[in-house]
Amino acid sequence: MNEVLEVIKNRRSIRKFQEKAIDDEKINIILEAGRWAPSFANTQPWEFIVVKDKKIKEELVVATAHDSIAQAPISILVIVNPEVDRMHHIEDGAIATQNMALAA
């Protein structure tokens, strides 16, 4: 079977995290997967922000109401700029996010 399809079928949502640091090499692989995502007219309207700081993650919990952010060793924020492409920026950001989720 196609390797990509296998990864898609075996993807899991993780809600409990270990208190173990994630290697920068692994983080870079995840970010690279996001950078390789397709986007409308190659506009790449995204920016990825890696958050490791516990205090900032706690502020993100308050802002998003997602408690699991505080327990995760890192969070990767996907920011999309509607000024780059007003019609497709949300979809482009979602595709980049999916690439990173599959790489993780």
Predicted features along the sequence, with ranges:
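Specificity-determining recognition surfaces
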Residues: 1-26
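A broad, low-specificity signal for short, low-complexity segments enriched in glycine/proline
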Residues: 5-13, 35-40, 98
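Glycine/small-residue-rich phosphate/adenosyl-binding loop
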Residues: 28-32, 36-96
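Short, intrinsically disordered, charge-balanced linker/junction segments flanking boundaries
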Residues: 100-104
